[in-house]
Every structure is written in C-alpha cells, then in structure tokens.
Design a protein with these regions (language model features):
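Acidic, low-complexity intrinsically disordered tails
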Residues: 2-20, 273-281, 311-326, 750-806
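Conserved SAM/AdoMet-binding glycine-rich loop
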Residues: 53-56, 69, 83-84, 88-89, ...
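N-terminal pre-triad scaffold of radical SAM enzymes
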Residues: 54-59, 426-462, 496-498
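Glycine-rich beta-alpha loop elements in corrinoid/cobalamin-binding modules
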Residues: 58, 66, 85-284, 297-390
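Terminal amphipathic helices with adjacent charged low-complexity linkers/tails
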Residues: 90, 219-236, 351-374, 392, ...
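Flexible glycine/acidic-rich beta-alpha junction loops that bind and position SAM and/or redox cofactors
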Residues: 113-122, 170-172, 199-210, 231-239, ...
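Amphipathic alpha-helical packing elements
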Residues: 187-199, 713-757
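Catalytic cores of alpha/beta
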Residues: 575, 640-655
Length: 806
C-alpha cells in the first residue's frame, strides 16, 4: 500500500486585528450604545451607517452577545455601526430604519440557532425566549437568517449582505434539518447572501469591511479564511487551484506495478513498449513554458488529463463544473510515497447536495470529511455542488479562521461595552430588572468569559464546529480589568462573580505542547479516547487567575458556573482542591452524559470511571474544607447509540447513587453535528464510511415518540407518572425482577393515587411561602441550555401520595 506524504504545517500567522488603518478619524469616538434609530444616529453626528447589523436577539451591549462583539470590533476599526434588533419581519420597512448602509448588512440569527431557540427537542414550540425582553417568545421567525436576508434585499437590493452567527455557521453546507426531517441546501444558497462568515468572525469581518471600504466588489472577495461563497459554472478564478474529488466512497484505487530495482527507468519503459523521451523533454522545459501548476513540485505530482479527478473518475460523469484543476499523483523517486499538491491551493470536492440528499452513505462521508478539515493549521478548502446542469453552483468554503492571539482576545474583550441592555428595553423606572428583564443577560450579568474554543469534541455539541478546537485565552490582566469593571459599573453587583469560565471551565491556557504538532493534527478530540500525550494539562495559570481574582477588593466570591471537564481536572489535584475549596457555591456542574460504553463511544465522552475518580476527589476536598457541596451531573436521553438496556442501566446507577433528575434533556439533532449525521444516516462518521456493511459501523438510533419517551422515563425513574410505562418496558425486556417494593428494585408495584404533576388552572389568592435555599443531595439538572430551569409540573418537587400495595 502506497502512503501519502504530508509535510508538517508551519505555525499559523495572520494580520493582527489592530494592524488596519481606521476607516474614519477618531473624532467620532465610541458610542455609549451602538445606534438603533435615526434619532440616536443624529445625536452621534452620523448621517449614515457604514455597517448595519440585523440580529434576532435583543441588543445587549455585552461581550457575551455576538452583535455587540462584532459591532464594537468594527467600531474600533473606525466604521459607523448601527443595530436593528429583532425587527418585525412582516415587511421590509423596519429594515430601512437606519437608512442604506454604505458598505454592507451584517445578518445574524443571534446567539442561538433560531429553530433550537423556538422548538424543544420534541419539536414543540417553546413559550419563552431568553434573548427577548420579558422572556417573551415569538420575536423572531423560523430560520430567521433566511427571512432577514430576504427583507434586507427587499429594502436595499444593491447592498452586499454578509451572513454570520451560529445558525448560518452550522448550515454552511448541505445539512440535515431535524424540524423538516430532510436534507436542506446550504443556507448561503437558500438565502442568496453574498458572503457567509462562519465561526468567531472578528478577523474575517474586519478584512471584508476594509476591502469593501476600498470599493472592492464583494464578488471578488474569495480568499478570506472563515468565509463561504457561491461560485458559478463559468467562474475561472479558481483555475490555479487543484481539486481532490471526494464525492464518492468505495471507488477502487489505482494499481501500481511493483518496481524492479534492477531495471533503470529507460529499461522499464522499453519493456512496456514506451519511451521516457517525453518525460525527459518536459523536465527540461524552462519554468516560463510550464502550464499553471504543472511542475510546482517537480516530479512529486502532475496535473491529471482534462476532466479527470484525483481518484480517476471523470468529472463529466458527475456533471461537475470543473472550476479547479484536477490532479493525479505519482510516487516520489526519493521516498516512494505519494505526494499531494500544496494544501493552501487544494480544494476537496464533497458529494453534491443532490447526492447527500438521496444517499445516506454519502451524507455520512461528507460529514466525516468536513470534520477532518477543521484544523486551521492543515484544513483545505471545500466545495459542494448545488443544482444540476446550467443552474449548478458551487458552495466554496475556505479554511477556518486563524485563532486570535492573547493580545487580540484582550483587544476584543477590552472594547468599551456598556455591559447593559439598550435603554429602550428599560421599564418605566429605567431598570432592566422588572418585567422587561432579558433572561439571557441576567445569566451572564456578573460573569466573565476567559477563553474560547473547546478540544473536547463531543459529537452532539456545536462548540467545536463553531469556535474550533484551539483554545484562545485572554491575559490575566484583561480578565482582572473586566472583574473590576463589573464591580465598579454594573448595577446590582453584590460582590459575587457568577462564573469565570467559557465553553468549558478548565481549558484556560491549555494547549498542545508543540505548535507544529497542533497544526498537523487531524484528531477530532484531544481528550478522547484518552488524553493526548501531547496535550499540556497544567492548570497552574488557571489557579493563579482564581487566586488573583478572589483577592480583589469588593469581590466576595468567585463561582465557577461553566461545565467542568472532569477527566482533565483529575490530572491536576491542586486545581480540584482550589476549585472545591473556594469556587463552588454548593453545586458544581459536570457532564458524564451517560454510564454505558455504547452511547459514550458515540458521544466521544470518557467512561464513568473518570467521573468516579473526580467524585472521590471532590468529596475529599469538600470534607477537608468543611463544606457541604454536591455535584450536578448532566445526562442525555435518546442519544444515537443508546439502547433501551443502556437507559435501564443508567436508571439503576442513578437510583444507586441517589440522583433524581428535575428535568430531562433529550438528544437534539443540531445541524452539522457528528451525532446528527449518525441520527440521519444510522452510520458512525467517526469510523470509516463504506457501503460494505462489514466495514461500516451501524448505529442504533432512538426514533419515534414512544421510544424517546421511554428513554426520558428511565432518566426520571422516580416520577410516578413514568412507572406504568417503565413497568411495561421492563416486562418486555425480561427484567420484571426490577419491579418491586424493595431497595434493590427500580420501580414499585403500586401506583399512587395522585402523581403530583397536576396544577389547578385557578389562580391562588395567596403567596406561597419562601422556599429555603438549603442544598439537596442527589439533585441533577439535565438541561444543557445554560439557562434557568423551568420549574413546572412535577419538576417543582411535589411529592406523590403513596398508596399501599394491594
């Protein structure tokens, strides 16, 4: 078998965010709030906006809200930025509120995917929206990025539209849509936006803004990392790129004849009835006469014949528009290995939209290739055809953006945020704590984000796809400045910082030991199936940050509200002791997600043994500190790869350890996640994809309301409402031995007269007594939203009345 040589990628570098000349003079200065109306623009002395950001969230000028980060980042570049937040989408008029932008519209659905924000995992409409004043639902349309782009085009048809945010980011290629149960086209094609920016887009949006300000047509901006755009069939600008065709699976590879070491090249050619004369003549051609790319690497590779792709299949057979030069490979005479063309000029052709829509195997294959090309150090561009014949278009996805440096992270987070919702949301008393309170802002009001990214790689999570695996950390000084700003400026601060974390609590300043190895790595996770030996797990910088933060004047307590990666934490007992002794407010959130190997392997999560090791350390250090503290584990029901027996074993583990879930999170197939590909295809993209059932790994999928309800019932085994369903299921599973009234049984034989879930619709004319905040052992919350749990029905803790068995 011939191997393919790949050179180690050099450390990444990019133009600094602060290296651009400001577009406007500094005389304007930062705005107290980015304007949301013509009147506010007039107060700032503006006659127009350079950029108008349209968002599905209410405008909160805080570094945890995407529109504020992008708006303030562009403002620091000298651009005049306006905000249109949660506009009425029934007409184009609200999109004209700030006039015609000079450069572009920036469109985003907000901090959350609009479909996940509006619908539960069971496809039921939510009654609330945490990113809207008063928590009211219905303030944004379904797939609001699409709707907003259409209205912006209707308002000002000649203004470029740049699409961003997590909703668009996770829909940049053809994707499975859980709500319609079908594969949809790239949002770039459906929306007809000019550019799509994916991931954290500060670097990309700054470059795009400055190039548009120089009057460069948006159609020519095709070389910015972290962007996607549409190429037509007749576009010749990609002629100097080299295309690797990955649009099929299980195609036979090329057979190479074994080389006779005792024959020269001329003798071998003569034995085959050919001659080396042409090859020798080609090698003697001056570089000025070589065709584009034909000898960039000399003998290492050559262009294929016209219309032929890297795997030997003719492009015409697929009806492809060949916008890049296909390549074939030959072994190097020095190493005997196949060599690829330069990665920075290589594009991989994914299966087309029409292919992945009708072929589950190709969908899983495309998902696998996409996730293998996510490391900024070695990722290649991707292209996916949408449409056929003369209407065919290519969605071209450039490699991911270069991660921000610590200095750049400090620049972004040190911008002059007001750290408050816009004054237009205040109540009659000018407060944001009344009926117009924005729940999402309330959650992060006194919290500090210290880093971005996550190298955990959990297959059900979108953080890695959006923010990347490389951790981008702020400096200690920048974090301390923000804490002091909260202390001195934010109304209602009582001395408690509610969170000092990020996507994960304990990945601050943790990185690969070698930037060269990091740039060449293609693993989807640094901690699964075990912690990579190249990962530096030193928690000392985080410990120093904790100690400095809690020593600040006026700061009484620093809590850690972000989820903890416990398999990483146990590598540093000193960190666990520091955390448990000083930074736990009674409960600490961790996410084992399950206890059984089947679902855990599909989630890429560590085994329950890692949880047990952390639990022992947690209890030991809590006892040494003289504190009564508990862990809150998160679990998911109905994840791909979960059998009914797996959920039964999880329920037994929960009962044995005294855990009772207040709420249950059912697996939610979000666009582009690996677990979603499993859900749609019944295949495991973590393994090789093949049409051969002996080579491809099938995944058990929990579909249908009845089975999903059963898996949720196992998580809430203590809820009497679920006992009839569980009894029936246990009997079918041959586990009737778990039905009984002893401690070793899972559920009893009797049924209480009342279940405790009924609530009278009649309004009570009395106020319930205040409930004490005493800690309860065994309390778990399995909602992954990060928002306050909805205390409804049986989740309120009503205890059913017991009925004696007959």
């Amino acid at each position: 078998m011939t191997s393919v040589s790949t050179a180690a990628a050099p450390p990444l570098a990019a133009r600094a965010l602060t290296a651009y000349k400001p577009f406007w003079a500094k005389r304007f200065g930062p705005a107290p709030f980015l304007p949301t109306s013509r009147a506010e623009m007039a107060l700032l002395g503006w006659d127009s906006c350079d950029v108008v950001i349209v968002s599905g969230d209410a405008y909160v000028d805080h570094p945890s809200f995407g529109m504020a980060v992008i708006g303030r980042t562009l403002e620091a570049q000298g651009f005049r930025v306006g905000i249109i937040a949660q506009p009425d989408w029934n007409s184009a008029e609200p999109f004209r509120a700030l006039g015609k932008p000079n450069l572009f519209f920036g469109v985003t659905a907000g901090n959350m995917d609009s479909m996940i924000n509006r619908y539960t995992a069971d496809r039921k409409i939510r009654s609330d929206d945490a990113y809207t004043p008063g928590g009211q639902g219905g303030a944004r349309p379904d797939r609001c990025s699409l709707v907003y782009v259409q209205r912006c085009k209707e308002a000002f048809g000649d203004v470029p539209i740049v699409l961003g945010g997590i909703e668009a980011s996770l829909r940049r290629i053809a994707h499975y849509d859980y709500w319609q149960d079908k594969v949809r086209r790239s949002m770039l094609v459906d929306s007809k936006a000019d550019l799509l920016l994916y991931g954290n887009a500060e670097r990309a949006v700054i470059e795009v803004a400055h190039r548009l300000a120089r009057r460069e047509p948006v159609q020519r901006i095709t070389d910015v990392r972290g962007t996607a755009f549409v190429r037509r069939r007749d576009d010749t600008t990609a002629s100097d790129w080299f295309e690797l065709d990955s649009s099929e699976v299980d195609l036979p590879g090329r057979l190479d004849e074994h080389i006779n070491p005792y024959q020269s090249t001329d003798e071998r050619a003569a034995s085959q009835g050919t001659s080396c004369a042409k090859e020798q003549a080609a090698n003697e051609l001056p570089s000025s006469r070589r065709t584009p790319g034909s000898s960039v690497l000399g003998e290492e590779w050559i262009p294929a014949s016209a219309g032929m792709t890297a795997n030997g299949v003719g492009a015409a057979a697929h009806g492809l528009a060949v916008v890049a030069m296909p390549v074939s490979h030959k072994p190097s005479r020095k190493t005997g290995k196949l060599a690829l063309p330069p990665r920075e000029r290589t594009v991989i052709r994914l299966p087309s939209y029409e292919q992945v829509k009708s072929d589950a195997v190709l969908y899983a294959h495309a998902n696998r290739v996409l996730h293998l090309e996510t490391n900024p150090g070695n990722a290649r561009a991707l292209v996916q055809r949408h449409g056929q014949g003369v209407t065919a278009r290519d969605v071209w996805i450039n490699p991911p953006p270069i991660p921000l440096t610590t200095a750049e992270m400090d620049h972004v987070f040190d911008l002059p945020y007001a750290r408050s919702p816009h004054p237009s949301y205040a109540d009659a008393s000018g407060s944001h704590d009344g009926p117009t309170k924005i729940p999402a802002w309330e959650m992060i009001r006194f919290s500090v984000n210290i880093m971005r990214g996550c190298f955990g790689g959990c297959t059900f999570c979108s953080i890695t796809e959006h923010e990347g695996r490389i951790i981008q950390s702020r400096s200690e000084d920048s974090v301390i400045r923000e804490i002091e700003e909260i202390r001195d400026r934010v109304k209602g601060f009582t001395g408690v910082i509610s969170d000092l974390g990020g996507p994960t609590a304990n990945m601050y300043r943790i990185a690969c030991k070698s930037t060269a190895i990091e740039s060449a790595c293609r693993k989807p996770s640094c901690v699964y199936p075990g912690i990579c030996p190249n990962l530096n797990t030193d928690h000392t910088p985080l410990i120093k940050l904790y100690r400095r933060a809690r020593s600040l004047r006026g700061v009484k307590k620093i809590l850690i509200g972000s989820g903890l990666r416990y398999d990483l934490a146990v590598q540093s007992p000193e960190y666990v002791k520091e955390l448990v002794t000083h930074h736990v407010g009674g409960y600490l959130k961790i996410a084992p997600e399950h206890t059984e190997g089947g679902p855990l392997s599909k989630m890429m999560k560590p085994g329950i043994g890692s949880y047990e090791r952390f639990r022992k350390m947690f209890e030991q250090f809590s006892a040494e500190a003289g504190k009564k503290q508990y862990l809150i584990p998160y679990f998911i029901a109905a994840h791909p790869g979960t059998s009914d027996e797996d959920m039964m074993n999880l329920a037994l583990w929960l009962k044995k350890n005294g855990f009772k879930a207040d709420q249950v999170q059912t697996f939610y197939p979000s666009p582009m996640a690996t677990a979603t590909a499993m859900y749609h295809t019944n295949l495991n993209p973590l393994k090789g994809i093949s049409r051969d059932p002996q080579r491809a790994e099938k995944v058990d999928i929990v579909r249908g309301e009845n089975r999903r309800r059963l898996h949720k019932a196992f998580l809430r085994w203590h809820d009497a409402n679920n006992w009839p369903l569980l009894r029936e299921a246990l009997q079918k599973m041959g586990r009737a031995d778990l039905i009984g009234n002893g401690k070793h049984h899972l559920i009893p034989t009797y049924q209480p007269t009342t279940h405790g879930s009924y609530e009278s619709p009649r309004r009570k004319n009395s106020t319930p007594a205040a409930v004490g905040s005493s800690l309860k052992r065994g309390r778990i919350l399995t909602q992954h939203t990060g928002l306050p749990p909805r205390e409804t029905g049986a989740a309120k803790g009503a205890v059913p009345r017991r009925r004696k068995p007959a």
